[in-house]
Curated annotation (Swiss-Prot):
Domain PLAT: 356-467
Leader sequence segment: 1-17
Keywords, alphabetical: Calcium, Disulfide bond, Metal-binding, Secreted, Signal
Cellular component per GO, a single term: extracellular region
Subcellular location as annotated: Secreted
Name of protein: Inactive pancreatic lipase-related protein 1
Gene Ontology terms, MF aspect: calcium ion binding; triacylglycerol lipase activity
Biological source species: Mus musculus
Gene3D superfamilies with a match to the protein in the record: alpha/beta hydrolase, PLAT/LH2 domain
PROSITE patterns linked to this entry: LIPASE_SER, PLAT
Disulfide bonds: 21-27, 109-120, 255-279, 303-314, 317-322, 451-467
Hydrolase keyword on record: no
């Protein structure tokens, strides 16, 4: 069904209305920049709060599986709930065609409960999101105003600080968060999970998510290819203090499975269909979900472009360190600047998405031959696979380096294993070795050196141990 809905709903809409006002929310017009522009040509007004029927579903550490409904019209529902003023409050706001009781929304709360005590409020506006895309994009304004109203009730009635509020919005939900933030002075943080492009990219700041909407705005871009012709749903525009572009921000690894295997997904037909239609777009919240339980597995590197990142021009982290994409990005919030900052990293194809980046530099010994070289790292937490370091003419004394992303943080590196081959019959049986291999983890400035005086024939592993002091001189 989602396949049949998605594209037509992006295109449908109707022209009507000029201005409408709602109690406690203010007035909404169809004047520029909200409508009648090249980006927003259709003149639509947002639906009424009654028609959208936004619900605020509270989960806490005390009720992690059954929500309590908080009502804007009755603050006593907050007082009677498990909401605790001493805790941070994180709102999770879904996007187009989604709903507040979707598995990923509830799972995000559950992951949080494993690492913190928190008020987790799922914002359900499915009646306003399950319509034509253009109408849903306009309904964002009312839903954002309602989220701001809920925060205002917390501030006024419960002496709660807006600085303790974190809004997490996916797709259209990211712009809901932006609207709420623009109405809430001192809002602590907004996380935009692949903010949607259509009707928002290139608009003035009051229409979309932007850095002024909270003290700290971080954004994860996973579907930033142009909507036409590539059907990329997310925006490529930098709209936060920190904008993260995992895997380049456009095409996520693991999203190119064939249609049947993608639709008949292990999580069921519905989840599989969603992934087939919008796999890249959905990866943003999947990365965030996993980041909650992996506080150091999504280190992101400041870099001018993904091409530079893949060309090994952005390693290691600068002196001030690298932020972690996702839940813990705000630990780096003191390093925000006036200009938006762009960060890159790679992820895995599927769970587990977390990766740890290493650079390996090796100096050859032995004969001059043509071949390819791989190394694997062994540490206190485990070992990596064999990773490609060099392919070409292997010359003794020459040094080559490469970077790779490991599925685990190996911990304290204890040894390195070297392997070479060329699969060419050579009656002289040449031997090649690595006199020294230097390993550096991306988040660290320290280099670790491993040495060997041996050489080996192809396809035979050579183990290098930490260099003696005299070996590194």
């Amino acid at each position: 069904m989602l396949i049949l809905w998605t594209i037509p709903l992006f295109l449908l809409g109707a022209a009507q209305g000029k201005e409408v006002c709602y109690d406690n929310l203010g007035c909404f017009s169809d004047a520029e920049p909200w409508a009648g522009t090249a980006i927003r040509p259709l003149k639509l007004l947002p639906w009424s709060p009654e028609k959208i029927n936004t619900r605020f579903l509270l989960y806490t550490n005390e009720n992690p599986t059954a929500f309590q409904t908080l009502q804007l019209s009755d603050p006593s529902t907050i007082e009677a709930s498990n909401f605790q003023v001493a805790r941070k409050t994180r709102f999770i706001i879904h996007g187009f065609i989604d709903k507040g009781e979707e598995n990923w929304v509830v799972d995000m709360c559950k992951n949080m409960f494993q690492v913190e005590e928190v008020n987790c409020i799922c914002v359900d506006w499915k009646r306003g999101s399950q319509t034509t895309y253009t109408q849903a994009a306009n309904n964002v304004r009312v839903v954002g105003a309602q989220v701001a109203q809920m925060i205002d009730i917390l501030v006024r009635n419960f002496n709660y600080s807006a600085s303790k509020v974190h809004l997490i919005g996916h797709s259209l939900g990211a712009h809901v968060a932006g609207e709420a933030g623009s109405r809430t002075p001192g809002l602590g943080r907004i996380t935009g999970l692949d903010p949607v492009e259509a009707n928002f990219e290139g608009t003035p700041e009051e229409v979309r998510l932007d850095p002024s909407d909270a003290d700290f705005v971080d954004v994860i871009h996973t579907d930033a290819a142009p909507l036409i012709p590539f059907l990329g749903f997310g925006t490529n525009q930098m709209v936060g203090h920190f904008d993260f572009f995992p895997n380049g921000g456009q095409y996520m690894p693991g999203c190119k499975k064939n249609a049947l295997s993608q639709i008949v997904d292990i999580d069921g037909i519905w989840s599989g269909t969603r992934d087939f239609v919008a796999c890249n777009h959905l990866r943003s919240y999947k990365y965030y979900l996993e980041s909650i339980l992996n506080p150091d597995g999504f280190a992101a590197y400041p870099c001018a472009s993904y091409r530079d990142f893949e060309s090994n021009k952005c390693f290691p982290c600068p002196d001030q360190g690298c932020p972690q994409m996702g839940h813990y990005a705000d630990k780096f919030a003191n390093n925000t600047s006036v200009e938006p900052q762009k960060f890159f990293l790679n992820t895995g194809e599927a769970k587990n998405f977390a990766r740890w980046r290493y650079r390996v530099s090796l100096t050859f010994s032995g004969r001059t031959v043509t071949g390819q070289v791989k190394v694997s790292l062994f540490g206190s937490n485990g070992n990596t696979r064999q990773c490609d370091i060099f392919r070409g003419i292997i010359k003794p004394g020459a040094t080559h380096s490469n970077e790779f992303d490991a599925k685990l943080d190996v911990g304290t590196i204890e040894k390195v294993k070297f392997l070479w081959n060329n699969h060419v019959v050579n009656p002289s049986f040449p031997k090649v070795g690595a006199a020294k291999i230097t390993v550096q983890k991306g988040e660290e400035r320290t280099e670790h050196n491993f040495c060997s005086e041996e050489t080996v024939r192809e396809d035979i592993l050579l183990t290098l141990l930490p260099c003696k002091t005299s070996d590194t001189m």
